[in-house]
Structures are given as C-alpha cells and as structure tokens.
Amino acid sequence: MIYLPDTNVWSRYLRGRDEDLPLRARVEAALADCRLSAIALMELEYGAEKSPHVPAFRLRITRLKEIVPAVAPFGTVAAYHAGFVRAWLARLKPNAQPIGPYDALLAGHALSLGAVFVTGNTAEFSRVPGLAVEDWRAAVGRKLRE
C-alpha cells in the first residue's frame, strides 16, 4: 500500500512537538510505504522561504527528503485526476463546493498513484470521489473512506 501524506502531515512531522508524537510514530512506522508529493514538497519549500527561520526549516526539509523513499513526481495522469476533482467539486457535484487548487492537485496526485491520502483535513478530502483518506493524528490511524 502506498501512502501520500498531505502537507499538513509532513509539517507536523517536521515540527516534532509533543502533541505530534503519535503522528510522528505512525509516519515512521509506515515510512517505507510513504511518498512525498512534489506538490507537498513545493508547499513545504514555500513555507520555509517565508519563515523567519529559513536555514532551520531548510535543514528539516533536506532531512525529510533523505528519509522518505521517494519524491513522487506530478505527471500527466495526476494532472488529469486533479482537473477532474476540481471540476467535479466545483460544478458537477450537486450542491457544489469547490476545493482549493493545491488540495485538488494533492488529491489528484494520490488518485493517480492509487495511494491512501493521509491528512488532518478529512472534511475537505472525504468529498473527493474514489479517494481513500486516513487521519493519522491519533495514535492509531483511522480509516475514513475507501
């Protein structure tokens, strides 16, 4: 099984605060099956650059890239899925509520990989058709949708 953690998961993992220890343990237990989305990496890079502590954040991102088995590139299949997700949630679904552009990219990326999307933002991503979503903030991951 492949897991594609959301940017918020990687951010909390890198932060390493006490309240993030259960999440950190869960990520580390599944690290061999985790992929770092190129989209999530871009969001982490952006956060580092706008931080007042650029060198410290940069070091954390470098370490993350060293321990995650692969950075998953965003290709044409992911682009197709992301476009579908954004359009479907914006106008095709009854009572449409659009999804943010980066969230659409991440959801499309997970769909293209056949990955379980790991996020703390389950309300947003559980609306995506066909996307398996898990929340690892608790000590034991909670499967929300397949």
Question: Which residue ranges define each predicted feature?
Answer:
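Short, well-structured N-terminal submotif of metal-dependent ribonuclease cores
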Residues: 1-37, 48-63, 142-145
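Generic structural signal for small/hydrophobic residues in well-ordered secondary structure
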Residues: 6-7, 44, 82, 110, ...
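Alpha-helix capping/helix-boundary segments
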Residues: 9, 40, 78, 106, ...
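Short, structured coil segments at secondary-structure junctions
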Residues: 30, 67, 128-129
